[in-house]
Curated annotation (Swiss-Prot):
Belongs to the glycoside hydrolase 3 family. Its EC number is 3.2.1.37, 3.2.1.55. GO terms for biological process: xylan catabolic process. A bifunctional beta-xylosidase/alpha-L-arabinosidase, exo-enzyme that acts synergistically with endohydrolases. Releases xylose and arabinose from cell walls. It catalyses: Hydrolysis of (1->4)-beta-D-xylans, to remove successive D-xylose residues from the non-reducing termini; Hydrolysis of terminal non-reducing alpha-L-arabinofuranoside residues in alpha-L-arabinosides. This is Beta-xylosidase/alpha-L-arabinofuranosidase 1. One of its GO terms (molecular function) is xylan 1,4-beta-xylosidase activity. It is found in: Secreted, Extracellular space, Extracellular matrix. Strongly expressed in young roots, significantly reduced expression in older roots. Highest expression levels seen in root tips, some expression seen in root nodules and in the flowers, but not seen in other aerial parts of the plant such as in the stems, hypocotyls or leaves. The gene is Xyl1. Keywords: Carbohydrate metabolism, Extracellular matrix, Glycosidase, Hydrolase, Multifunctional enzyme, Polysaccharide degradation, Secreted, Xylan degradation.
Amino acid sequence: GVQRYTFDAVVSQQDTILSGLDLDCGSYLGYTSPLQGLTAFVPTS
């Protein structure tokens, strides 16, 4: 079946909130923040 993931992140410089991102199978989420040195990958396979 299809697996869904929710990713919430705060980008300090932009004060931007990324929320409720739904990804389908075979997709992945890549988030990077140079300021925070944060890298997150969410495989949905």
